[in-house]
């Protein structure tokens, strides 16, 4: 007997067109929308609520490490960038620049920059803050006693992207950027790796998004960095998403900004600096890691609300008793804790059919949905729908009827179960798509051939070439639309030769298509 077909909430499926599906999830889940400025988005309440959860949880981790929050100017003098040649070259094509401070009428009903109001020095709209924070550090640091100096800021940045996609690559985005200064390389590298581990644990914990951490190859380093480390997540189409980076900057920026200190021997020395950051790109990662053909599925730890209660109102005299019952359940739930916090519950009393509101919340990815009718209220019952177990075999929503008290006793456990299930599902999918039996360039070409619609990642041996030899490999990979993501820190030692150079492999690398 054939199983009945499921009628999914979205009109486009992941398997048919992943890019269109991604845009559909953003629209239907009401996460964000395009604005009147190319490449800039309006983040709607549900999308911003996820970012606020990320902020709250990560800010606590940052402060636990002794890092203090600051705020630095949005506008940075152009001369700050010209002090560090490699850094300015890396960002030059993306910089937005302010040249005037006043507008005047153009005589045609419009406005134009006032020629008399040209700035003496152009101001760059913050693409990242190493230069301006370095200038502040040079004033704050005098002695070894001032180190380490650990700062962070939550801010917006602007990088004028040519090809934009909401949450993944926008001209303006929100992020946190940590900037620290240290007495020597060892202490700075310790901080670089601490931040990397914080990001790894955060991705795999609250975001339920498995990642692989490791150093980037020389050609993929942050402009001006000595070493760049990343966490890489696999999306459901097999592409890699760089979800966070941590950089050891050596004395490069200290030299440019004059960050010096008097060491214990009374001599002047340059500080060693780091920077590290994650952005609203994490929300794009959550969408493409956990979304399905019915919309978004939000891990409970970062969901703005974890449970929604939908009373099935009839516009009759029984509604008051039903609402009172629903409020009683809400009041009981918010006294309970999960993941070290109170459970977040919304009683949705908006007018409209409960079924319509149910599908709106399904598309938003609400972890638990309760539907409660008049008979449920009379019998002390609830109907519970887990977003990660949406469908029954008969293609109907997988509601489970429970006694109210039983649900209250199990609500926290259910949320923990959803969090774990989302991670386990994503981890199993990723692990199944990391290929380790490709050993030469022809095999690489074959794996990423057009017939393989959603290939995963290839892990290969690597001789760690530099200079022209590395450039040659980068061009070979570019022709296949591939990049080296990173060197997995927990990978086994390679055996045999590097497929690109023929020399003995000294480490392993991940090769993938990416966002």
Curated annotation (Swiss-Prot):
InterPro entries assigned to the protein according to its UniProt record, in alphabetical order: aa-tRNA-synt_IIb (IPR002314), aa-tRNA-synth_II (IPR006195), aa-tRNA-synth_II/BPL/LPL (IPR045864), Anticodon-bd (IPR004154), Anticodon-bd_dom_sf (IPR036621), Pro-tRNA-ligase_IIa_arc-type (IPR004499), Pro-tRNA_ligase_II_C (IPR016061), Pro-tRNA_synth_II (IPR017449)
A Gene Ontology biological process term: prolyl-tRNA aminoacylation
Superkingdom of origin: Bacteria
Subcellular localization, as worded in the UniProt entry: Cytoplasm
Enzyme class: ligase
CDD domains (UniProt xref): ProRS_core_arch_euk (cd00778)
Chemical reaction(s) catalysed: tRNA(Pro) + L-proline + ATP = L-prolyl-tRNA(Pro) + AMP + diphosphate
EC number(s) reported in the record: 6.1.1.15
GO molecular-function terms, A-Z: ATP binding; proline-tRNA ligase activity
Family matches, as HAMAP family: Pro_tRNA_synth_type3 (MF_01571)
Description of how the protein assembles with itself and partners: Homodimer.
Known role: Catalyzes the attachment of proline to tRNA(Pro) in a two-step reaction: proline is first activated by ATP to form Pro-AMP and then transferred to the acceptor end of tRNA(Pro).
Domains (record comment): Consists of three domains: the N-terminal catalytic domain, the anticodon-binding domain and the C-terminal extension.
PANTHER family in the cross-refs: BIFUNCTIONAL GLUTAMATE_PROLINE--TRNA LIGASE, PROLYL-TRNA SYNTHETASE
Family: Belongs to the class-II aminoacyl-tRNA synthetase family. ProS type 3 subfamily.
Protein name, UniProt field: Proline--tRNA ligase
Protein's organism: Novosphingobium aromaticivorans (strain ATCC 700278 / DSM 12444 / CCUG 56034 / CIP 105152 / NBRC 16084 / F199)
């Amino acid at each position: 007997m054939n199983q009945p077909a499921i009628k999914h909430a979205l009109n486009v499926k992941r398997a048919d067109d992943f890019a269109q599906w991604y845009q559909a999830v953003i629209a239907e889940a009401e996460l964000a929308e395009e604005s009147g400025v190319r490449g800039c988005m309006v983040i709607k309440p549900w999308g911003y609520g996820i970012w606020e959860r990320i902020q709250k949880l990560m800010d606590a981790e940052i402060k636990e490490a002794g890092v203090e929050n600051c705020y630095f100017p949005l506008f940075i003098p152009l001369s700050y960038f010209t002090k560090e040649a490699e850094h300015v070259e890396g960002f030059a094509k993306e910089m937005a620049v302010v040249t005037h401070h006043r507008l005047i009428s153009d005589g045609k009903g419009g406005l134009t920059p006032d020629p008399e109001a040209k700035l003496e020095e152009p101001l760059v709209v913050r693409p990242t803050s190493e230069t301006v924070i370095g200038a502040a550090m040079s004033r704050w640091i005098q002695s070894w006693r001032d180190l380490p100096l650990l700062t962070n800021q939550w801010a917006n940045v602007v990088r004028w992207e040519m090809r934009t996609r909401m949450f993944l690559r926008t001209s303006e985005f929100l992020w946190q950027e940590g900037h620290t200064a240290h007495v020597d390389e060892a202490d700075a590298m310790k901080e670089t790796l601490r931040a990397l581990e914080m990001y790894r644990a955060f991705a795999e914990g609250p975001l339920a998004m498995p990642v692989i951490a490791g150093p980037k190859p020389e050609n993929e380093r942050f402009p001006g960095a000595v070493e760049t480390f990343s966490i890489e997540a696999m999306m459901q189409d097999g592409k890699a998403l760089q979800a966070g980076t941590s950089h050891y900057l050596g004395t490069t920026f200290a030299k440019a900004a004059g960050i010096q200190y008097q060491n214990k021997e009374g001599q002047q020395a340059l500080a060693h600096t780091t920077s590290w950051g994650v952005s609203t790109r994490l929300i794009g990662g959550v969408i493409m890691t956990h979304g399905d053909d019915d919309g978004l599925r939000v891990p409970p730890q970062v969901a703005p609300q974890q449970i929604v209660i939908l009373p099935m109102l009839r516009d009759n005299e029984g509604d008051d008793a039903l609402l009172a019952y629903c409020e009683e359940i809400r009041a009981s739930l918010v006294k309970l804790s999960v993941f070290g916090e109170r459970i977040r519950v919304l009683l949705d009393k908006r007018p409209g059919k409960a079924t319509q509101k149910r599908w709106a919340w399904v598309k938003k990815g609400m972890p638990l949905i309760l539907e409660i009718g008049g008979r449920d209220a009379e019998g002390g019952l609830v109907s519970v729908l887990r977003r990660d177990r949406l469908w029954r075999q008969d293609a109907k929503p997988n509601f489970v009827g429970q006694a109210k008290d039983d649900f209250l006793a199990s609500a926290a456990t259910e949320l923990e179960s959803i969090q774990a299930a989302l991670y386990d599902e994503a981890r199993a999918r990723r692990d199944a798509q990391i290929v380790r039996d490709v050993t030469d360039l022809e095999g690489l070409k074959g794996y990423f051939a057009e017939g393989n619609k959603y290939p995963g990642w290839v892990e290969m041996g690597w001789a760690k070439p530099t200079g022209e030899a590395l450039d040659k490999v980068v061009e070979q990979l570019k022709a296949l639309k591939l990049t080296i993501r990173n060197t997995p820190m927990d990978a086994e030692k390679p055996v045999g030769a590097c497929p690109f150079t023929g020399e003995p492999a000294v480490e392993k690398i991940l090769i993938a298509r990416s966002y």
